[in-house]
Amino acid sequence: MIIVTGGAGMIGSNIVKSLNDKGFNDILVVDNLKDGKKFKNLVDLDITDYMDKEDFITQIMAGDDFGPIEAIFHEGACSATTEWDGKYIMMNNYEYSKELLHFCIEREIPFLYASSAATYGETDTFIEEREYEGALNVYGYSKQQFDNYVRRLWADAEEHNETLSQITGFRYFNVYGPREQHKGSMASVAFHLNNQMNAGDNPKLFEGSDEFKRDFVYVGDVAAVNLWFLENGVSGIYNCGTGRAEPFRAVAEAVIKHHGKGEVETIPFPEHLKGAYQEFTQADLTKLRAAGCDVEFKSVADGVAEYMAMINK
């Protein structure tokens, strides 16, 4: 059995789909369906069982056995970069993750987890090293702190000549693609621009967006990276992006191209995002490629075109 936490979320459900595509369906999905709309991400997927997140945490902390587990993909987290309840964020993204990590280490279960490019903050160097990290919000800090916790475990194991089971973290950059309709304001730019155009409006970007560039990565490619690392048993913390920074306007132009009409309009930059907004991200893929991962990443033009075709049927 493979366990996918956050399995009803965007990345988690795409990992489940990729597993299904490979003929694997002995999967336990763990999530919180308080937002019942997320169930739609599971309707077309084959899984063995579903468990509520709180029940799962309780059983993990009690040391309960779930039977033979081949791997755990830990995608469950509060992913809202605009959430400032630090106690809530640290409990969900840090404490819960530590409990699950030690559960896996004790049983030698491969543990593949979601980190984030939000760990880097305002920098133009995106290398998986401590010196380049400086989160701008509490979400990014929770991910940064968990990465550092994992690093300390590796250092301690090395000092004592011990070898830990597989632990692999992925610093996701700007992920977009299918199964994100439940995310509200945290859904991708492509999703929001498409909704605007379907409502008869022009696509709207923040003022200054011509200067903002992000590494936009297609969710299908993210799932492929996760499965590659499971299949190859490689540990480490790795950037998961395309290695290319593209302007927000490129996303808007891809959406406009699909619809065959429209032009970009600008709106004021939100006050609440000032000082907590990454204006530039670009994954350095040196470490990912050195590990042997050869997954090819779609450009914005190709990825958004595929995405638009899927959600505008």
UniProtKB/Swiss-Prot annotation:
The keyword Isomerase applies. This is ADP-L-glycero-D-manno-heptose-6-epimerase. HAMAP family: Heptose_epimerase (MF_01601). One of its GO terms (molecular function) is ADP-glyceromanno-heptose 6-epimerase activity. Signal peptide: none annotated. GO terms for biological process: ADP-L-glycero-beta-D-manno-heptose biosynthetic process; carbohydrate metabolic process. NADP(+) binds at residues 10-11, 31-32, 38, 53, 75-79, 92, 143, 175, 183.
